[in-house]
Amino acid sequence: MKTKGALIWEFNQPWSIEEIDMGDPVKDEVKIQMEAAGMCHSDHHLVTGGIPMAGFPVLGGHEGAGIVTEVGPGVEDIAPGDHVVLSFIPSCGKCPTCQAGMRNLCDLGAGLLAGAAVSDGTFRIQARGQNVYPMTLLGTFSPYMVVHKSSVVKIDPSVPFEVACLVGCGVTTGYGSAVRTADIRPGQDVAIVGVGGVGMAALQGAVAAGARYIFAIDPVEWKRDQALKFGATHVYPDMEAALLGIAEVTYGLMAHKVILTVGELKGADIDSYLNITAKGGTCVVTAIGSLLDTQVNVNLAMLTLMQKNLQGTIFGGGNPQYDIPQLLAMYKAGKLNLDDMVTTQYKLEQINDGYRDMLDGKNIRGVIRYTDADR
């Protein structure tokens, strides 16, 4: 079928809305009419080259929600009409890693940046006669998708699509970073560096886990104000102010848990984050930096002598098939505020405006909302 999508053809160029050709679902694949797509900072890394796909052109988007329209042979637990969220981490349930309970590290994830379909190794999308590389095997910046069933999670049909799309990456990653990877305990003090979409979800996780003080650090004043509304007890504009402020509030003990959710992580800054981490504390690396940034600035002696932990995480250490419906159930019960995380909704043609707003610090999360006019 012919549809359209937001493509990039080379680094540091704007998104281009173009006609694309999309194949039908084959064995184990699902066709989805997209209703909403989250605008995550990771897709901007595609533009800058921080996350390079295996080739060009690239179809962006890895947060999305929609309605199943067709399924291929071998798909038994998903049917046309189902409302679904796309998980940027596939979860086969069969590989050794999934069997060990680490579905966020599914072996299918090895192909996230390769572009070829998991099902048969071919390319399902073409543009201008060339194969298209969809972001994390998804490509939610298009009103239609054909994806492997391992990336599809059924959800409660009463959840609004513009909210549901957030749990495909940002919310699940942030919330899980707090309650799973950081394992925040009641009464602990927590610092969250960067309070965009992922950071605001981590903040809500810290609140739910019973943190005593929650320190939110962000250079954008509006985001700091929003962080206070979401449950932060103290806010700071930069690491220098945070170092002094956290030391004063905790009498020099610092934060038991630090969660890094900045827009772009830099190895040179890691030591400043460890400096606000308490003795025996954990600094969780949730944010992603450039794949070319291989140098990390750490005082190894202090890391050892203070017994601090520097812990990486992907998808917040969660299980897509469990965590996505669970977080949406919490939303339905009024225990998770997702409505206020959607700052602005855009048309697909406004994608460059949306990313400009993100870079200017105007959004917690921007969302592309599809209409019949897009199809």
For each feature predicted by the language model, list its residue ranges.
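Glycine-rich cofactor phosphate-binding loops and adjacent beta1-alpha1 units
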Residues: 182-185, 224-309, 374-375
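Residues in the short beta-alpha loop(s) of Rossmann-like NAD(P)-binding domains
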Residues: 11, 220, 289, 316
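Redox-cofactor binding/interface segments in oxidoreductases and associated redox assembly factors
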Residues: 35, 86, 192, 259-260, ...
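C-terminal hydrophobic helical "lid"/dimerization subdomain
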Residues: 1, 240-241, 271-275, 279, ...
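Cytochrome P450 core scaffold surrounding the K-helix E-X-X-R motif
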Residues: 42-48
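Glycine-rich beta-strand-centered segment in the early N-terminal region that forms part
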Residues: 23-37, 50-99, 104, 112-114, ...
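Mid-domain Rossmann-like dinucleotide-binding core that forms the NAD(H)/NADP(H) cofactor-binding site
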Residues: 143, 150-152, 156-244
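Cysteine-cluster motifs in flexible loop/terminal segments that predominantly coordinate metals
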Residues: 88-150
